[in-house]
Amino acid sequence: MGRKFFVGGNWKCNGTQESVSKIVDTLNEPTIAANDVVTVVVSPPYVFLPDENAELKHEIQVAAQNCWVKKGGAFTGEVSAQMLANLGITWVILGHSERRTLLGESNEFVGKKAAYAQSEGLGVIACIGELLEEREAGKTFDVCFKQLKSFARFPAKPWDNVVVAYEPVWAIGTGKVASPEQAQEVHVAVRDWLKTNVSEEVASKTRIIYGGSVNGGNSLALAAQEDVDGFLVGGASLKGPEFATIINSVTAKKVAA
């Protein structure tokens, strides 16, 4: 397949200088899978971005959890993609369900933010996913495809730096996790959508990762699925040793190959 495994850690609104330092120490250990087989990106709150970008070994990249839709201006409390790029931040998470549901971010708004972030050279972790009632109503694909459409305004080339994160909302922070078969089913559908609506090349190369109660106990089975190209990890990414286990689940790709 040729798609490099990708593991992102979304720390959300968590962490103190002490706890963050412990996670960094773990991630800097040589037991973490090599950079040539897995891309590791951590996403701390804004206040920790400069320090973690400096303190983490160079193989580990840093992402912001959000950015503003424009260059800057009179937008109190917002941070622009230009500012992030100036700090040396390389990725940004956009479209996370918590921002969609709690802050009312629409598909269109998320798409505009992603397009601007790309224009500033940031890689985008593009989040999609359905609510429990939408899954039970058989609307999983419809919901995910509508969300994908908002990201499809990218020209072909910038898709090289886009990772699609399928995060079923019913599995985020609930302890429930999609089965490996459920994850694979949606990832295949997403790849087919990209093939039809963007290009066959983009569909083949784009990494589609899974998020939603991923932990050290289930990551290996999920990673063994052909179209699961990695993870976006929430709570478990705050536990250094467990996050390391998830990163090292890339070994499942070698077993499955």
Swiss-Prot record:
Question: Origin organism of this chain?
Answer: Stellaria longipes
Q: In which tissues is it expressed?
A: Higher levels found in leaves than in roots.
What name goes with this protein? Answer: Triosephosphate isomerase, cytosolic
Into which EC class is this enzyme placed? isomerase
Which EC number(s) are documented for this chain? 5.3.1.1
* Positions of the catalytic residues: 96, 167
Identify the gene encoding this protein: TPI
Keywords associated with the record: Cytoplasm, Gluconeogenesis, Glycolysis, Isomerase
**Entry-linked PANTHER family:** TRIOSEPHOSPHATE ISOMERASE, TRIOSEPHOSPHATE ISOMERASE, CYTOSOLIC
Q: Catalytic activity, per the record?
A: D-glyceraldehyde 3-phosphate = dihydroxyacetone phosphate
| Summary of subunit composition and partner proteins | Homodimer.
Q: Which domain of life is it from?
A: Eukaryota
The answer to whether the entry has keyword Isomerase is: yes
